[in-house]
Swiss-Prot record:
Pfam (any one): Choline_bind_1
Gene behind this protein: lytA
Listed name of the protein: Autolysin
Enzyme class: hydrolase
Matches recorded under CDD domains: PGRP (cd06583)
Biological function: Autolysins are involved in some important biological processes such as cell separation, cell-wall turnover, competence for genetic transformation, formation of the flagella and sporulation. Autolysin strictly depends on the presence of choline-containing cell walls for activity.
Predominant localisation class: secreted
Reaction catalysis annotation: Hydrolyzes the link between N-acetylmuramoyl residues and L-amino acid residues in certain cell-wall glycopeptides
UniProt comment concerning the protein's domains: The C-terminal domain could be responsible for the substrate recognition.
Provenance organism: Streptococcus pneumoniae serotype 4 (strain ATCC BAA-334 / TIGR4)
Cellular component annotations (GO), alphabetically ordered: extracellular region
Amino acid sequence: MEINVSKLRTDLPQVGVQPYRQVHAHSTGNPHSTVQNEADYHWRKDPELGFFSHIVGNGCIMQVGPVDNGAWDVGGGWNAETYAAVELIESHSTKEEFMTDYRLYIELLRNLADEAGLPKTLDTGSLAGIKTHEYCTNNQPNNHSDHVDPYPYLAKWGISREQFKHDIENGLTIETGWQKNDTGYWYVHSDGSYPKDKFEKINGTWYYFDSSGYMLADRWRKHTDGNWYWFDNSGEMATGWKKIADKWYYFNEEGAMKTGWVKYKDTWYYLDAKEGAMVSNAFIQSADGTGWYYLKPDGTLADKPEFTVEPDGLITVK
């Protein structure tokens, strides 16, 4: 598990004394929060206003404070029990974005409990374990907090209290393989990650996934290599000949659309230099400008005369 420590503060006070018997689960309560702006704010703010150890968001984890040090994070007596305090951002715009961070959140909370030698239990009557801020608010001595996070935010994305407890105590069950919603398809790996803004070969077939992780289908894409690629309605990258919008195109083995002259099964074809569509029933001037080639109605190069020059200069083809 990769953790960014670029904003780790080393000047935070110790709260309480070891051993620390709890890992605290929070969410930021800020609908505009990002992992970076939360880390930046935590870096410069007065610790007496509160501090924590980790932030999860935007597909990454940032550690901003020490562990095994206590924290001012729950507003009461259990500040002195904080082995680690983890914040989840609240600015996700899609379920996929949320689930990416939720997986990291669950994994981090469980890993921190293991690291501290604590049971991976959630909000139980035992002092030791993983506790939500809500549970601390309702059960800690000398409470001065009214926070109930992270439950309301989790519920917004369909994670019930029961589901959260199950995931904390048993690990997150990841639905792998192809997934679908109203927007489209995406592909989930065994670690919960999914391809974004890249080609990926799945079961022998190449696909392309956009910046949000959705599979491209029935559309063109100009890649950073300067080549055009076509993905059919199943998402499969085109190779060889493909008929698209009543025009024929040719794609090489790497999926790149070809232009100009192409030799296929010992026969020459010409593909429009700009658009890539196969030229048929037309003349193409030679590169040196000294003559013309004729492409038959099926697009193949004529290797013998297939046209006639009439007395009035009109050229007719057979």
